C-alpha cells in the first residue's frame, strides 16, 4: 500500500493512495479530515478486538470502516450496483469505493498520518 499526505491550497491535509487502496484515501479525506480523535478511537477499538474474532465498524457519512484482528475494509456506503442491466463484458470501476488491507499496515499508515498532522501544526 503506497500513499502520501499533502496540504492542499487551503491548508487542509489530503491523502493519495495507490490504485487498489484509493478508498482508504477517500475515507481519510472525507471521514477523518485530520481529526486525531477518530484515529484514537480506531486504535482503542483495535486494542479491544485484538486476539479475538470480533469485528468493529465505524460508519461515516460517505464511507464505513470495518476491521477485525487481521484485516481492514473501507467501503463506500453507496456501494450497491445492479449488474443485471450491464452489457456483457462491462464492469464497474469501484477502486475508489472499496479497499482492503492488513490491520498492521493500516495502523502504520494511521501513525504516519498522525505524524504528518502533528508536524503540520508543530504540536
Swiss-Prot record:
UniProt cross-references to InterPro entries, sorted A to Z: UPF0231
Pfam families, A to Z: UPF0231
Protein origin, superkingdom: Bacteria
Alphabetized NCBIfam families for the sequence: PRK05248.1-3 (NF003576)
Similarity-based family: Belongs to the UPF0231 family.
Protein name from the UniProt record: UPF0231 protein plu3616
Organism per entry: Photorhabdus laumondii subsp. laumondii (strain DSM 15139 / CIP 105565 / TT01)
